């Protein structure tokens, strides 16, 4: 599955994990602060244009856009399933309109 994420400055991609899906992100434009939690260890990285990072299943992650006007991130994942996103803030899963999808046929 391929997704393109458009985030404005200081916008937060909320803290979540996936039980099955592995994600690889490519920073196409801008800069982000990536926060990972794996086995109770917190890791913070600053990533810029051209950087990549892979998140394995079970790793809690979030990122915040640190550049103005924002950032563009390409996501490649093993598959796409709304039911495999588990947000730390449980109210996010209740919002059925939390994402905008565009299909290109």
List each model region and its residues.
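Tight coil/turn sites that cap or link beta-strands
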Residues: 8-12, 50-52, 56-58, 68
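Glycine- and acidic-residue-biased ligand/ion/polar-headgroup-sensing regions
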Residues: 19-38
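A short glycine-rich, His/Asp/Glu-containing loop-to-beta-strand
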Residues: 1-15, 21, 76
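Short acidic-glycine-tyrosine-enriched beta hairpin
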Residues: 38-61
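Double-stranded beta-helix
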Residues: 64-105
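Structural motif
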Residues: 31-33, 52, 60, 70-72
């Amino acid at each position: 599955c391929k997704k393109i994420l458009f985030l404005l400055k200081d916008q937060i991609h909320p803290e979540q994990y996936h039980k099955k899906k592995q994600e690889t992100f490519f920073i196409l434009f801008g800069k982000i602060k990536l926060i990972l939690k794996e086995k109770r260890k917190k890791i913070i990285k600053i990533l810029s244009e051209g950087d990549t990072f892979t998140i394995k299943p079970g790793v809690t992650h979030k990122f915040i856009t640190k550049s103005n006007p924002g950032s563009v991130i390409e996501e490649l994942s093993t598959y796409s399933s709304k039911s495999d996103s588990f947000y730390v803030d449980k109210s996010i899963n209740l919002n059925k309109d939390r994402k905008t999808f565009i299909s290109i046929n």
